[in-house]
Amino acid sequence: MKKMLALLSAVLMTGAFLIPSAHAQDIRARMKQRIPQIAELKKSGVIGEDSKGYLAFVNGKGNPQADAVVKTENADRKTVYAYIAKKENVSVDVVASQRAAKLAQIAKSGEYIQKNGKWVRK
């Protein structure tokens, strides 16, 4: 489990994607490009990190642009989680929940995180 968490952190925190092919570079570039948009949406309280390792709207839905950011980020996260799960021979849910714990830990003060199914500001 510690090995998997270390691998997950390396993949997502440093951007050192281990997914073979140019597809990995595409994912990395897309995720990097979305960082400012995600940061702004978090800062404004529109989205937060849910307890399953994905972005979610705190109060329903956002505007079409925010919806697109969340949808594409979550799709890319799922791809990364699936690769790690396959490599580590665990479920995607295990990888995602480990990442959720890390994201909650590193969330900035004032950002929303999901705890026990409820949104709370860190």
Regions found by a protein language model. Name each.
Residues M1-L8:
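Bacterial N-terminal signal peptides that target proteins for export
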Residues A10-V11, A22:
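Cleavable N-terminal signal peptides
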Residues L12-F17:
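Hydrophobic core
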Residues L18-A24:
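Sec/Tat signal peptide C-region and signal peptidase I cleavage site
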Residues Q25-A68, T72-A75, K86-K122:
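Amphipathic, charged alpha-helical segments and their helix-to-coil junctions
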Residues Y81-A82:
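Contiguous, amphipathic alpha-helical segments that mediate oligomerization or scaffolding
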